[in-house]
Each structure stands twice: as C-alpha cells, then as structure tokens.
C-alpha cells in the first residue's frame, strides 16, 4: 500500500513538472503581450513611482541565489537518482555555471548600477525559485538519457550554442561595464563585439545560451525556459533600442534590436 502511494506521488510530480513547463510558456506569452504596452520597470526604464528600492549588487545576488542553491541541493542530495548519469550531470552543471556567474561574479563586477525596485527584485526571486526547482528537479529525478547522449548531434550542437552564448553574454557585459571611465556619468553608445550589429548583444547571448541548453536537454522544461527567456528579453531589448534612438541622434541606424541582420 505504502509503495503504491509513493509511486503515485512520484508520477504526480512528473506530471506536475510538465504542467509547470507549459505554465512557463503561457506566462512567457503574457509577458510578451504586456511588453508591447508597458515599459519594463527596472534599470534605466524604472518608473520614479517605485519608491522602495534595493541596491543593485544586493538585488542581483539575492534574486539569482535560488537558481544556484536549488541545483546545488540536488547535487548534494542522495535521493537524486538521475544524477548518476553523465548527461544529467553535465546539463545541470550548465545551468549551475550560468547562475554561479550571475550570483557570485557578475554583481561584484558591476560599476555603480541603479537600485532596483523592490517589486522587480521580488518577481525575479519568484521566477528564479520556480525555474530553479523546475530545471533541477527534472534533471535530477526524471530526465532519462542514453549513456551516449553526450555524443548525439542535438547535445553537441546545443552545448556549443550554450557555450558560445555564455561567452557572448559575458563579453557584452564587459563592454557595457567599461563604457564609463572613472568619474564619468551618463550613458554612452556601446561599441565592439556584437554591439556592432545589435543593440542588445548581452541579451542575444543569453537567449542563445538557453536555446542551446534546451536543445541539449531535448525537454519540454528546457524549451519552456528558453521560450520564456526570449519573451522577456526581447521586450527589454526593444525598450533599449527605442531609448538609444531617442537619446542619441548619432546612434547607428543599421543596428538591429536583438538578432543580427534579422530583428
């Protein structure tokens, strides 16, 4: 009796993880629709009406932490059967490397940074908790891969996209950080790297990263995360592009918003 109940609960969790992935896609569609009407309220687009704010460095550490802590917990757990498989370990490590950088390195490289509205920080914490659980739980308990999955073209191409996307993202962040010299204030036009082709090179890199992860994982959960990332960051990129065009008369008109030569 107890065994049957336990098996039913496990199957219920598997169905729930699939449902959460579809929910993430639905929320992504809602975010995409909302971004057509409303500015995204943090950074340079933050509304003055948001009075309660969190220092930028602290906000980044706190909001990204769940997506680092939850996978680490799964690695440490003795009840994570799928992490005995190399493909699962590598995929979860890909997720961890990104959030390790985002939580423990990126915030401490920031130069200044506007305080983040508490509401935006809270929503980011909620998302990172939701997605950190979804990805880590699926990979540690439910994702089944053949031992030779790491030689499958889908995994190899996906891993290559993930790595290239992360490098683009980190390099683009480096360019943005170094726009201002000590004592400088105000904004400048980013130049170099993929910024020669798009306004939001850092976002392009992150979207590429998670599309690669989705391909390598070949899962609904990975695809849902990549889709949500595109929905959220594409709206943010459009706001950036519009802002630069309004702010700088000399802004390069040939630059696309997010995807080189296309969009």
Curated annotation (Swiss-Prot):
From which residue to which does any coiled coil extend?
A: none
Q: Name one Pfam family in it.
A: Steroid_dh
Q: Does the keyword Lipid metabolism apply?
A: yes
Cite a GO CC annotation. endoplasmic reticulum membrane
Q: Where in the cell is it found?
A: Microsome membrane; Endoplasmic reticulum membrane
Question: Which EC class, in a word?
Answer: oxidoreductase
- Topology within the bilayer: Multi-pass membrane protein
Write down the superkingdom of origin. Answer: Eukaryota
Catalytic reaction equation(s): a 3-oxo-5alpha-steroid + NADP(+) = a 3-oxo-Delta(4)-steroid + NADPH + H(+); 5alpha-pregnane-3,20-dione + NADP(+) = progesterone + NADPH + H(+); 17beta-hydroxy-5alpha-androstan-3-one + NADP(+) = testosterone + NADPH + H(+); androst-4-ene-3,17-dione + NADPH + H(+) = 5alpha-androstan-3,17-dione + NADP(+)
Q: Does the keyword Chaperone apply?
A: no
Function statement? Converts testosterone into 5-alpha-dihydrotestosterone and progesterone or corticosterone into their corresponding 5-alpha-3-oxosteroids. It plays a central role in sexual differentiation and androgen physiology.
Family statement: Belongs to the steroid 5-alpha reductase family.
Q: Which PANTHER family match?
A: 3-OXO-5-ALPHA-STEROID 4-DEHYDROGENASE, 3-OXO-5-ALPHA-STEROID 4-DEHYDROGENASE 1
Q: What is this protein called?
A: 3-oxo-5-alpha-steroid 4-dehydrogenase 1
Organism from which the protein derives: Macaca fascicularis
């Amino acid at each position: 009796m107890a065994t049957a109940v336990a098996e039913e609960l496990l199957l219920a969790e598997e169905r729930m993880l699939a449902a959460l992935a579809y929910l993430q896609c639905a929320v992504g569609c809602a975010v995409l629709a909302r971004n057509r009407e409303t500015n995204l309220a943090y950074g340079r687009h933050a509304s003055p009406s948001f009075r309660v704010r969190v220092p930028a460095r602290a906000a980044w550490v706190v909001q990204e932490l769940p997506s680092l802590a939850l996978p680490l917990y799964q690695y440490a757990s003795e009840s994570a059967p799928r992490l005995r498989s190399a493909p699962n370990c590598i995929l979860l490590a890909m997720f961890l490397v990104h959030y390790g950088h985002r939580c423990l390195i990126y915030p401490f490289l920031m130069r200044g940074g506007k305080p983040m509205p508490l509401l935006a920080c809270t929503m980011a914490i909620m998302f990172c908790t939701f997605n950190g659980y979804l990805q880590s739980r699926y990979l540690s308990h439910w994702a089944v891969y053949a031992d030779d999955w790491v030689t499958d073209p889908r995994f190899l191409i996906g891993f290559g996209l993930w790595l290239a996307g992360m490098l683009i993202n980190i390099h683009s962040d480096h360019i943005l950080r170094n726009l201002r010299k000590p004592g400088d204030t105000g904004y400048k036009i980013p130049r170099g790297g993929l910024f020669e082709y798009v306004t939001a090179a850092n976002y392009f890199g992150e979207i590429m990263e998670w599309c690669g992860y989705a391909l390598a994982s070949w899962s609904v959960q990975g695809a849902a995360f990549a889709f949500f990332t595109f929905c959220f960051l594409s709206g943010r990129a459009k706001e950036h592009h519009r802002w630069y065009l309004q702010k700088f008369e000399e802004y390069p008109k040939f630059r696309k918003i997010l995807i080189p030569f296309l969009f």
